[in-house]
Amino acid sequence: MSNMDFLPISKEDLKKRNIDVLDFIIVTGDAYVDHPSFGTAIIGRVLEREGFTVGIIAQPNWNNIEDFKKLGKPKYGFLVNSGNIDSMVNHYTASKKKRHDDFYSPGGKSGYRPDRAVIVYCNKIKEAFKDSPIIIGGIEASLRRFAHYDYWDNSVRRSILEDSSADLLIYGMGEKPIVQVSNLLRYGMKIDSIKNVRGTTYIEKDISSLKDYIEIPSFEEVSTNKKSYAEAYKIQYYEQDSIRGKTLVQKHKERYVVQNPPQPPLSQEEMDEVYALPYARTYHPMYEAEGGIPAIKEVKFSITSHRGCYGSCSFCALTFHQGRVIQNRSQDSILKEANMMTNMKDFKGYIHDVGGPTANFRHRACKVQEKHGTCKNKQCVFPKACKNLIVDHKEYLSLLRKIRKIPNVKKVFIRSGIRFDYLMYDKNDEFFKELCEHHISGQLKVAPEHISDKVLNLMGKPTRNVYDSFVKKYYDINKKIHKNQFLVPYLMSSHPGSDLKAAIELAQYIKKMGYTPEQVQDFYPTPGSLSTTMYYTGINPLTEEKVYIPKDQKEKRMQRALLQFSIHDNYDLVKEALIKAHREDLIGNGPDCLIPYNKPYKKSHKKNNAKNNNNHYNKNNNYNKNKDISKKNKKNSLSKHKKRK
């Protein structure tokens, strides 16, 4: 592909297109990948469709002001985002250690973007072009639009609008608001006069003219009073709906952050239009010499079928970004994309995914949402299914069958998360059966996250019984279709509410599973999530109940070690945790014991894998099917718990 297949990135590109001055310049923390899985590509192509000229400055050197000047000054303004991931999450692990890789950068190497990229980029743009309007968007801006707890500073920060000095913030999915804002600018309206576009947030000195709004506790209040913080979050959480949501206001000293209500979800026709735009569907050729951009590998042959999620997991901030209302593409649109993929030169016959935030949420949760919006204080699937929930996989199954029939398609995988409780609510097993038969490559990844019901309740996840039922049904179906397929459970340690007792309960469950899960992570308090509010305040803002928070680093390491108790290096931490919790009964050689009395000699990794009854996964998350594992071990260690998720 040539540069002409992409949006312009240089003065040379502008010259070839006979563009003297660009209308907009997008500055992004990611490398430039022109694919609909990347927000920069979508916004750029949407604006191009509307008749605007758009240039891209990807990962500018923030220490060199000239990098921000290389495309000149835009006619209407700069659009700034940190990339597909919050820059702090991208750069640091849950234990605040620096990451050494970055899948959204050339060659997968880190160091191409600054911490707090949106703020840094905006400050540099103001330095280069003092009076040029700046509009911020994307995940980093969207989830930091109000005063928010910042895990890396361990303090409450102001709205990112204040810290970045941007003129306007677009939150959530930005196609509709950016078109409306850009057209207002084209008609001659000044950026500081644009105050009525849904899905936008701005700073205001005087709110006397505002009507029908809710004022939440101020920055000064939430930064000094945790109850006020919890109250502010609760109001934000309840008002994220395009039909019933109100304008929200939060005072920051003498000014006010004003959030207009969310934009209505995209219609199916609008979704189809967005995904039919002329994307190059790969990274810009300028990265070829550096090894390309690793992030394209997972999405190049994946299809986004819908947006939104009504699962409402507490640790996920999707409610604040994509929303709870499902927005889906038509089958025709998806089939056209699948057919197009088969004509790409590097297509090998495998479509890696057809899904969204939750693969099997292909339609709205209920008909009530269409007229009245999402319920204010009630969830669709938690703690149990709402009586109005539409449980039906028929349309999704129909779509998958059609894709499977496309010439040159060998296999269609589903790698987006499957919501197993929703799957269990469906009395028709047809989808479940075909999922196992056609759409899994030996294993299905599922996210029970924990097994203690008190922790699951705080996570917004279904109870252990639901998961156990799913596990059993999964293996029953696989047995019937004569497939030896496994489950890979994602598990989380140190979530709010999880104490050592809960972690030990999970460790005992893992012991019965018969293998050590690799998909384990510590809870990561990222901006915008309900769980992060619990972590900071020690309060569940929705119930106002106090919540136990494991903040001590030693305890957090113990909880994580318990989830991988059979790993040699974790022995001391596990033993210390069991003694601290007065669970010495789990130390010894009995069948229920987690560890022996004495620390065993450390074996080589290769040798340990061959003899380990826990049957570690290999690096590709496949079960290590070593010949040394007897059939008896396989049967007893694995078959019971393959059913999970």
Swiss-Prot record:
Question: What NCBIfam families would the database entry show?
Answer: SAM_YgiQ (TIGR03904)
Q: What is this protein called?
A: UPF0313 protein CLM_0251
Compositionally biased intervals (Low complexity): 610-624
Q: Which UniProt keywords apply?
A: 4Fe-4S, Iron, Iron-sulfur, Metal-binding, S-adenosyl-L-methionine
Q: Residues in domain Radical SAM core? A: 295-566
Q: Which residues bind [4Fe-4S] cluster?
A: C309, C313, C316
Q: Name the species this protein comes from.
A: Clostridium botulinum (strain Kyoto / Type A2)
Q: Where is this region: Disordered?
A: 598-645
